[in-house]
Each structure stands twice: as C-alpha cells, then as structure tokens.
C-alpha cells in the first residue's frame, strides 16, 4: 500500500455522494416531522456513515473494474494508495458505526432497514452488475431508501402515501440518471465487459427503454399534484411543470444526453424543495 492521504479517504468514501445521501435522509425526516430534532441529525449522520462504508466496500469489490474505467481509475485502491485490507476494514468500521447510530436514532426498525440497505447494495447489486444488464434495478431499490430511513427514524407512518411517492420518485430517477452517465464511459464499460443495456441491447431498443424510464419518472412526478399531497395550488403548478419538463427531456435523452441528465437531476431537486416548502408552510408571497 502506498502513502494514504485524507484526500484518498475522502475518495474512498465518496464524501460528496455520502453527503447527498445524508441530505436525502434529512429531507425524509423533515417531511415526516417538520422541525429539527436530534433524531433528524442522528439519522442523517448514520446514513452518511453507511453510504461511506458501502462505497469503501464497493471499491474493494470492484477494484479490477475501476482500474479500466477512466473516471474511476484514479481511485486509491486501483492506484495502490490504499490496500484491499485497509479499505475493507474502513468500510466495515463505517458501516458498523452507522448501524449503531441508526439504532440510536430510530430503534430496531431503523437498524433492520440499514442492514437491509447494505445487504442489497454490497451483497446483491455489486455482484449482479457483472452478470445482468438490469442489476441497477436492485441497486436503485437500495439507493432510494435514504428518505425512507429519515422518515421512519422520526416516527413517520410506513404506509404514508407521501412516503410511497417520494420513494418512487427516487427509485425512478436513478435509472435514467445512471444510464445517461454510463453513456460517457461506454467504451470503458465495454472493455470491462459489464452488461449494461447501452451495450447489450440494440440502439433503438435501448433508446425506447430509456424513454420509457423517463416517462415513468414523469408520471411519478405528476402523481404529486394529482394526489392530495400539496396544500398550495402554486406548488402543484410548479410540480406539474417539472413533470412536463421530464417529458421534454425524454425526447432529448438520446440526442442531447447532457441536457436530459441535467433536467432529470434538476427536477428531483425541485420537487424535493417544493415538498419541503409546502410541508413547512413557509410563506411565499408569489403563492
């Protein structure tokens, strides 16, 4: 193992992604209980630790793949700056502490959810990536859980329509988001022999499937104003416009990949903000 720096550790835990996971957890908690408590903060910290631990373990599992993909080749394990043993120990330590904090925040139910997320992401999704082009469906199921973790940790009802809609939004957003990102490194993925739909399906079939996912994502967004989830008419109009923007992005998904990706990501952020503002009942003079 070469010299390990703080920057290497940050790259190992993918701190930006882990921070976004923590933010999604905090968002879910605020939707359930719209005022900050220690439980909100503990649940967010727990998912940050879990995400960082999952990332470290994932990079150990996929070190050979990371080495042949330009975007990931500079990660510390493929470069030899962090060894497999050190990466594994750090990942397990972060996951274990994350589980402890999550149990402290939300009790046994939250702990079991946290264990399930790690089991699905590192135990199922990561190995399946080498075997099937639709492994992302498994990964997305785990990736959509952070808002659920936050919601449940603060005592939100598990069968709430709001929770179902938010989980569905996160789930459906991940598919086009990842596929559009993967198009940037298609030749590297081909070299790594990963069976992505972009590579394993005929172009026309892949394009149709990508549009289907965009349309499904748009329908999920349009469900928000269709059901009584928002109090303010202005907020319903804004979310409806977001759904229309996704339908537009579906038409651009193949020809204007970057534009479609930005729209997909921006819509998720916009809907999160709208839901939170509506839940907090923040006065906005425009509406």
Curated annotation (Swiss-Prot):
Q: Where are the transmembrane segments?
A: 19-39, 100-120, 134-154, 162-182, 212-232, 233-253, 267-287
GO BP annotations listed: heme O biosynthetic process
Q: Where in the cell is it found?
A: Cell inner membrane
One GO molecular function term of this record is:
protoheme IX farnesyltransferase activity
- Specify the pathway: Porphyrin-containing compound metabolism; heme O biosynthesis; heme O from protoheme: step 1/1
Record's bilayer topology term: Multi-pass membrane protein
Q: Which domain of life is it from?
A: Bacteria
Any one GO cellular component localisation term in the record: plasma membrane
Q: Which Gene3D superfamilies match?
A: UbiA prenyltransferase
Its chief place of residence is membrane
Q: Pfam families recorded for this chain?
A: UbiA
Quote the EC number. 2.5.1.141
Reaction(s) the record says it catalyses: heme b + (2E,6E)-farnesyl diphosphate + H2O = Fe(II)-heme o + diphosphate
Family (UniProt) = Belongs to the UbiA prenyltransferase family. Protoheme IX farnesyltransferase subfamily.
Miscellaneous section: Carbon 2 of the heme B porphyrin ring is defined according to the Fischer nomenclature.
Q: What does this protein do?
A: Converts heme B (protoheme IX) to heme O by substitution of the vinyl group on carbon 2 of heme B porphyrin ring with a hydroxyethyl farnesyl side group.
Q: What is this protein called?
A: Protoheme IX farnesyltransferase
């Amino acid at each position: 193992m070469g010299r390990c720096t703080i920057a290497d550790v940050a790259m190992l835990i993918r701190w930006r992604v882990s921070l976004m996971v923590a933010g999604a957890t905090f968002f879910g908690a605020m939707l359930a209980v719209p005022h900050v408590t220690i439980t909100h903060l503990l649940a967010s910290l727990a998912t940050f630790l879990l995400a960082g631990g999952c990332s470290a373990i994932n990079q150990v599992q996929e070190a050979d793949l990371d080495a042949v993909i330009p975007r990931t080749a500079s990660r510390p394990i493929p470069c030899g700056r962090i060894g497999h043993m050190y990466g594994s120990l750090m990942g397990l330590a972060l996951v274990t502490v994350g589980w402890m904090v999550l149990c402290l925040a939300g009790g046994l139910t939250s702990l079991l959810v946290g264990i399930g997320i790690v089991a699905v992401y590192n135990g199922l999704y990561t190995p399946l990536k080498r075997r099937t082009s639709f492994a992302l469906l498994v990964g997305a199921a785990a990736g959509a859980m952070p808002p659920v973790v936050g919601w449940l940790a603060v005592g939100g009802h598990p069968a709430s329509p709001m929770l179902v809609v938010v989980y569905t939004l996160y789930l459906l957003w991940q598919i086009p988001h990842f596929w559009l990102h993967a198009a940037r490194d298609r030749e590297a993925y081909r070299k790594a022999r990963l069976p992505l739909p972009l590579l394993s399906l005929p172009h026309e079939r892949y394009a149709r499937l990508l549009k289907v996912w965009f349309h499904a994502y748009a329908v999920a967004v349009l469900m928000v104003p269709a059901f009584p989830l928002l109090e303010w008419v202005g907020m319903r109009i804004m979310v409806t416009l977001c759904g229309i923007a996704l339908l537009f992005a579906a038409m651009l998904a193949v020809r204007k990949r970057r534009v479609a990706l930005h729209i997909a990501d921006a819509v998720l952020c916009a809907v999160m903000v709208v839901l939170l503002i509506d839940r907090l009942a923040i006065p906005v003079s425009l509406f």
